[in-house]
Design a protein with these regions (language model features):
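Hydrophobic transmembrane alpha-helices and their immediate junctions
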Residues: 133-165
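Membrane helix-loop boundary segments at the extracytoplasmic
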Residues: 128-131, 164-192
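C-terminal luminal/periplasmic domains and tails of membrane-associated envelope-modifying transferases
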Residues: 240-440
Length: 440
């Protein structure tokens, strides 16, 4: 009954669906609750009904946004698997390859690289993407063998309630794995694997020394990996603390010390060496005082760190953004433009990327292209009040040719000679607010 309570409190569609199907299968296979618990069972159903009727739960269960995002996850996963059909992109590499196929439609924090997606919320698709047909066949074979063994056990002794319960657990696990990620949830997967071992006993006989030796070997390897994970997490936390304090030297030192063959990414999929690039760039800029002028001789070390970060994670949005900014600071506008374009191919609505791409286009004299970017940009209020954005708008509107074919921009051809910069910017923002939906 604790399990039933946990299912009710989970308030997730996959658990409720899996629990319902598992209960239905258990009843179909002959399980009947004892008389003294039937009232408790009916009470649980009543609680489930009341929860389902409550506003917050209905909003959570019926919200289509999660399903829409999952469709993006799955579509990108199928693309990964199609490019690497036999062996997949490699264990743990889904989160690296996911941005390659585009972040449009993702939450703003994901589109900006503040957070990242690390799994597709479907373990079968996840295994197929990371380990290809080979891994998927083995994963499916594992479940098929459990089902076959469970069916045989049930047929031999239909009166044994444990066999029906095990079949129901398999259904619940299968449904849950189709919409979530039990493979990465130890609280779910460890008990399930223990039950799988318990119900599968009596198979191939091995000498006691052999399976004990294998058990100790696997436990030792798991312990080694767990120890490295704990150590890595501690060093990564030091990097994040230095970064939050903006201690340039400390960031570079802690980030370079943290990198090892065991540890290249933090928990948010940021390459650790990226932080070294930020620390180096920040420190060099600080050392040059106020209003410095940067040239091609500046930020060489930071550029090297960013290149190392992109070698680890080629589609890392934040590294691409900061590398493009680095080129812009050095007035290397051609490379800045190319890098912003690479960023925006991955994350078309990246706010800083859109704004500074327009700034770069202005610097190259491509004012109409800059104006087109700005009029279509989805930005938040903090960007609209940014002086860089305001200057970019005015410069693009005043510099674009009168022959522009963009109907929206044609509106400003006549008024730009009559309005001062502040009024021209305000007119642009008014037009934009009527034309473009507000960024979420």
């Amino acid at each position: 009954w604790l399990g039933v309570g946990a299912i009710l409190l989970a308030q997730t569609r996959s658990i409720w669906l899996g629990g319902t199907l598992a209960l239905g299968l258990g009843l179909a296979l002959g399980w009947r609750p004892a008389k003294n618990v039937r009232f408790v069972f009916l009470g649980g159903l009543a609680v489930a009904g009341l929860l389902a009727l409550s506003g917050p739960v209905q909003k959570r269960l019926m919200n289509p946004a999660n399903l829409q995002i999952r469709q993006v996850f799955w579509h990108h996963s199928f693309q990964m698997q199609a490019e690497h059909p036999l062996t997949g992109v490699g264990p743990g590499q889904w989160r690296i390859h996911f941005p390659k196929y585009g972040l449009e439609g993702m939450n703003p924090s994901v589109a900006e690289g503040v957070t990242s997606e690390v799994r597709p919320h479907n373990d079968f698709i996840w295994v197929a993407a990371e380990m290809g047909y080979v891994g998927l066949v083995l994963f499916l074979a594992f479940f098929i063998l459990l089902i076959v063994h469970g069916v045989r056990a049930y047929r031999k002794d239909k009166a044994h309630v444990g066999h029906a319960a095990w079949m129901a657990i398999l259904v619940l696990t299968g449904v849950y794995a189709f919409f979530e990620f039990p493979l990465e949830r130890a609280a779910f997967w460890v008990p399930f694997m223990a039950l799988a071992g318990w119900h599968s006993r009596g198979g191939i006989a091995l000498p006691k020394k052999v399976y004990l030796g294998l058990a100790f070997l696997l436990l030792g390897l798991s312990g080694r990996v767990a120890w490295q994970a704990i150590q890595s997490d501690q060093t990564n936390q030091t990097v994040l603390e230095q970064n939050s304090r903006k201690d340039a030297r400390g960031i570079v030192q802690s980030a370079t010390d943290a990198v090892s063959s065991w540890n290249e990414l933090d928990r948010f999929s940021n390459p650790l060496i990226y932080f070294a690039g930020m620390g180096s760039m920040f420190g060099e800029a600080q050392s040059m005082g106020q209003n410095p002028t940067f040239t091609s001789a500046n930020f060489k070390q930071a550029e090297g760190y960013f290149n190392e970060a992109l070698a680890v994670h080629p589609y890392h949005v934040v590294t691409l953004y900061q590398k493009a900014n680095l080129y812009r600071y050095r007035r290397d506008y051609a490379n800045a433009m190319a890098t912003y374009e690479e960023l925006l191919r991955i994350s078309p609505r990246h706010p800083g990327g859109q704004m500074h791409y327009a700034v770069t286009l202005n610097a190259l004299g491509n004012y109409e292209a800059a104006a087109r970017v700005l009029i279509a940009a989805f930005l938040g209020q903090e960007y609209y009040s940014n002086p860089d954005y305001q200057r970019a708008v005015v410069e693009a509107l005043r510099g674009m040719p009168a022959s522009t074919r963009h109907r929206g921009l044609q509106t400003f051809i006549g008024m730009r000679s009559q309005l001062d910069d502040a009024a021209l910017f305000q007119a642009f923002q008014t037009f934009k607010s009527q034309r473009v939906p507000k960024a979420r």
